């Protein structure tokens, strides 16, 4: 066992000697008291974990756990509180989450080639799902709401039905203005 440890330490020393060529690593080693070889091995290990997260179904599974379980738990808690702020936070989250999933569904063939996609997606879902960041509201106001207003005609203080009702009433009023006095249009208010 001690032979293996000696061989590993010798290999790490050789790596340290090779890494002496890079001033950035030397500076990093001064700032944090960790040998350059450990920094490199940590980076390589982290790199392979990221690759692992993006291969097969495990990346998608971990991302969905972060996107469903954690906000789902907070949503259940929010339903039991008397205030409305946390309800709004998670209703906004679920709208953003659904929008992301629709986008992801239609672009999965492209997203497959994005390196570390599931890692970025997981970080994004945690950002929008955890209440301390308020990311869902920011993403909703910056992206989803303007898109929804264009596509679905959502008005700030009324739904699509209010807008349609106002348009219909405007059309009735315009039609009535063209009907001579004393004649009925057959439309009641």
From Swiss-Prot:
Q: Which GO terms describe its biological process?
A: endoplasmic reticulum tubular network membrane organization
Q: Which InterPro entries match?
A: TB2_DP1_HVA22
Record topological domains on the Lumenal side? 56-57, 106-108
List GO molecular-function terms, semicolon-separated: membrane bending activity
Q: Name one Pfam family in it.
A: TB2_DP1_HVA22
Keywords of the record, alphabetical order, are: Endoplasmic reticulum, Golgi apparatus, Membrane, Transmembrane, Transmembrane helix
Q: Which residues form a coiled coil?
A: none
Q: Does the keyword Endoplasmic reticulum apply?
A: yes
Q: Which domain of life is it from?
A: Eukaryota
Gene Ontology cellular component terms for the protein in this record? cell division site; cortical endoplasmic reticulum; endoplasmic reticulum membrane; Golgi membrane; nuclear envelope
The answer on whether this UniProt entry bears the keyword Transmembrane helix reads: yes
The record's subcellular location field reads: Endoplasmic reticulum membrane; Golgi apparatus membrane
Entry's transmembrane regions: 36-55, 58-78, 89-105, 109-127
Q: Which residues lie on this side of the membrane: Cytoplasmic?
A: 1-35, 79-88, 128-189
Task: Kindly give the membrane topology term recorded for this protein.
Answer: Multi-pass membrane protein
User: Which family is this protein grouped under?
Assistant: Belongs to the DP1 family.
Domain remark in the UniProt entry: The short lumenal loops between transmembrane domains 1 and 2 and between transmembrane domains 3 and 4 may impart a wedge-like configuration, thus deforming membranes.
Function in brief: Required to generate and maintain the structure of the tubular endoplasmic reticulum network and the vacuole. Induces high curvature in membranes and causes membrane tubule formation. Involved in membrane/vesicle trafficking.
Quaternary organization: Oligomer.
PANTHER family, A to Z: HVA22-LIKE PROTEINS, RECEPTOR EXPRESSION-ENHANCING PROTEIN
Q: What is this protein called?
A: Protein YOP1
Organism the protein comes from: Yarrowia lipolytica (strain CLIB 122 / E 150) (Yeast)
């Amino acid at each position: 066992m001690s032979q293996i440890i000696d061989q590993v330490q010798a290999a790490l020393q050789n790596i340290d000697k090779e890494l002496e060529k890079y001033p950035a690593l030397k500076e990093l080693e001064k700032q944090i008291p960790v040998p350059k070889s450990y920094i490199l091995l940590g980076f390589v290990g982290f790199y392979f974990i990221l690759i692992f997260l993006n291969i097969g179904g495990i990346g998608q599974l971990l991302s969905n756990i972060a996107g469903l379980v954690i906000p789902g738990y907070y949503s259940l808690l929010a339903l039991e509180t008397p205030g409305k702020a946390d309800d709004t936070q998670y209703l906004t989250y679920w709208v953003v989450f659904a929008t992301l999933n629709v986008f992801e569904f239609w672009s999965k063939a492209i997203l497959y080639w994005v390196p570390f996609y599931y890692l970025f997606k997981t970080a994004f879902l945690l950002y929008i799902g955890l209440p301390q960041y308020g990311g869902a509201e920011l993403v909703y106001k910056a992206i989803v709401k303007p898109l929804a207003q264009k596509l679905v005609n959502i008005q700030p203080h009324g739904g699509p039905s209010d807008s349609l009702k106002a348009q219909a009433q405007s059309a009735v009023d315009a039609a009535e203005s063209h009907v001579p006095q004393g004649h009925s249009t057959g439309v009641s208010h």
